[in-house]
Amino acid sequence: MENHDSFYKFCQLCQSLYDADDHQEKRDALERHFADFRGSAFMWRELLAPAESDAAADRELTLIFETILSIERTEQENVTRNLKCTIDGAAVPLSRESRITVPQVYEFINDLRGSGSRQERLRLIGQFAAGCTDEDLLTVFRVVSDHAHAGLSAEDVMELVEPWERFQKPVPPALAQPCRRLASVLVKHPEGALAEVKYDGERVQVHKAGSRFKFFSRTLKPVPEHKVAGCREHLTRAFPRARNFILDAEIVMVDGSGEALPFGTLGRLKQMEHADGHVCMYIFDCLRYNGVSYLNATPLDFRRRVLQDEIVPIEGRVVLSAMERTNTLSELRRFVHRTLATGAEGVVLKGRLSSYAPNKRDWFKMKKEHLCDGALVDTLDLVVLGAYYGTGRNCRKMSVFLMGCLDRESNVWTTVTKVHSGLADAALTALSKELRPLMAAPRDDLPEWFDCNESMVPHLLAADPEKMPVWEIACSEMKANIGAHTAGVTMRFPRVKRFRPDKDWSTATDLQEAEQLIRNSQENTKKTFARLATTYDGPSPNKKLKLN
């Protein structure tokens, strides 16, 4: 197995830098070495061009190495092999084969710098030199005398090595806050805003280093391989000039015609249900590209233009997100209404000159629930069918509740969603005491009236659903979708809007009503936003939009 941290490789790199004829050739040699690097990048960078150094200690170490190796600092470029090491008049036997590693040398040099006396440093060098070749010792001398980089600046080394140091270290994502007044976007960003389609998929941060790729989720965890199958090859083709980058993107499952499939179809089992489906990646931001960082200071306009200049779109596989420049409130409003009329999840609004701010909510997001004073929010009146115990201080309390509705055709209760009560501790305790007499731990064989997937069986189940309370559950979006719940309904971001003591099981929403409500909701939403967008005469947000 290849050892990317072999000090022999470090020696070879240093010699190639010395042998290079000009500055660009040195940069090319360094870049080639790190093209598929898998070692300790931080230590390599510190040995080549340390960010900080102890000048006094390094001067003392340089003098010591000049003495024991019998060479001058200025002669390093012309030194070849067959060096001898002599300490206190005694020759130190050197190794014929290099066995040491970069981490060992890094630790050794730090120990040398931390040693107080010359005699202690000589002792450490004598011990370490016994396992070194003459080339190893020459390279260590180059490191302590600040000659390992052979004239490359610290900025050169940082630029060429840092992408691999950053590799596998995800950057906290920039975030968006809910927007209920479009005017507030232009108040914060008077220079104008970039309005972008919000895709109904999963956010992913893409790292490329040479031929290697890593994918991280919104929570900075590795993305399962089945969700990014084929993306490496398509990204390589889409960015043919890229040596390294960090991109922000959204992955969405699309069918053979390029139409987006419902949220949740990125899962392994769901993918199997769509034989012609595949992953499409929508790129919307650039954090780093070919060694240049665009974090914190670079305007979005510029970052977007970098992407436009570099990408070769692959339709249905790797494309830029649909985005449009807006300068007035009417332009912003029309884009939002037109986008929502297509059934998109929402829009994201960003200042044209805004920087990429990790972990900060500097962007705005708008969904249909944020418009029309919440009149377009989907709600269902559902019955509490079960409960799950919480964790931590809520370990003995009902913390999450299973909501469901009656299928009147089969007279069976189906599950719709799980929801947190949103109550404070005292109120949650009172609610638990109220509901506990109406519930019991389910037996292995579930009652005939209850249709529930095994993964959703609650810790406590209603003894009689007709005696359970009704709650109004709101969500950002409601779709017909066969998933974890048996009703075939998906509620995105469900929450308890209010308790409904005025209703009982007979007046709650049943399955047939829920299905009709979903159809009506989707149709009414599209009609509403299509009407609001009738004066909009710009390009369709479903197509790739270019900045002027």
Curated annotation (Swiss-Prot):
Binding site for a divalent metal cation 1: 250
InterPro entries the record matches: ATP-dep_DNA_ligase, DNA_ligase_ATP-dep, DNA_ligase_ATP-dep_C, DNA_ligase_ATP-dep_cent, DNA_ligase_ATP-dep_CS, DNA_ligase_ATP-dep_N, DNA_ligase_N_sf, NA-bd_OB-fold
Cofactor list: a divalent metal cation
Catalytic activity: ATP + (deoxyribonucleotide)n-3'-hydroxyl + 5'-phospho-(deoxyribonucleotide)m = (deoxyribonucleotide)n+m + AMP + diphosphate
Annotated GO biological process: cell division; DNA biosynthetic process; DNA recombination; double-strand break repair; lagging strand elongation
Record Pfam families: DNA_ligase_A_C, DNA_ligase_A_M, DNA_ligase_A_N
Binding site for ATP: 196, 203, 218, 250, 284, 361, 365
Single GO MF annotation: metal ion binding
Positions of the UniProt region annotated as Disordered: 515-548
Catalytic residues (UniProt): 198
Annotated positions binding a divalent metal cation 2: 345
Function, in words: Able to ligate a double-stranded synthetic DNA substrate containing a single nick and inefficiently ligated a 1 nucleotide gap but did not ligate a 2 nucleotide gap. It is able to ligate short, complementary overhangs but not blunt-ended double-stranded DNA. May be implicated in DNA repair and recombination.
Record family assignment: Belongs to the ATP-dependent DNA ligase family.
Protein name: DNA ligase
Gene: LIG
